[in-house]
């Protein structure tokens, strides 16, 4: 009886496994367009403490500049990066909320959510992953309203102490 059940399960699973290996995407691979580089200055981080969800940290965003092919300006003091680190310390989710001001005086709200992971991957290799997905809220009647209608991804990098650089791309 058990042997028959195992054979039936193997036969039922085989078509799924073989078809999954040969999947061909039907849609075109998304293209990326570089939008801007943000050079963010950070204040002194502080810890809220252990919560039910993990260890909460806050990093004030104190300013900076941004530049790209279609816009440039400053990062407004007053935002923060709210981070939540897992109990094992390997995974941190982040939510940075701040505003930028374009060179011509338009304020744009930014909410950037991401993941930082440091640990072993499925092959057992040490890995470090840090990516985020910013969303922009520009005034609907501004020349920057195009920012409201797309998906963005960013790759962070570290420079001088107290700074972080974010390269932002639009997914086309």
Q: At which residue positions do the language-model features occur?
A:
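Bacterial N-terminal signal peptides
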Residues: 5-15
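Sec/Tat signal peptide C-region and signal peptidase I cleavage site
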Residues: 16-20
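Beta-strand-enriched cores of mature, soluble protein domains
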Residues: 21-172
């Amino acid at each position: 009886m058990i042997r028959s059940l195992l054979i039936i399960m193997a036969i039922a699973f085989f078509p799924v496994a073989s078809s999954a290996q040969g999947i061909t995407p039907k849609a075109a691979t998304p293209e990326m367009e570089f939008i801007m580089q943000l050079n963010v200055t950070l204040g002194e981080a502080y810890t809220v403490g252990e919560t039910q969800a993990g260890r909460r940290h806050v990093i004030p965003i104190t300013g900076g500049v941004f530049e790209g092919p279609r816009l440039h300006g400053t990062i407004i003091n007053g935002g923060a990066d709210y981070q939540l680190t897992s109990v094992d310390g390997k995974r941190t989710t982040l939510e940075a909320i701040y505003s930028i001001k374009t060179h011509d005086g338009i304020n744009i709200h930014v909410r950037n959510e991401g993941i930082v992971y440091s640990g072993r991957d499925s092959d057992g290799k040490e890995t470090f992953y840090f990516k985020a997905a910013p969303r922009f809220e520009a005034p609907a009647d501004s020349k920057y309203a195009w920012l409201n209608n797309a998906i963005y991804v960013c790759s962070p990098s570290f420079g001088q102490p107290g700074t972080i650089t974010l390269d932002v791309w639009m997914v086309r």
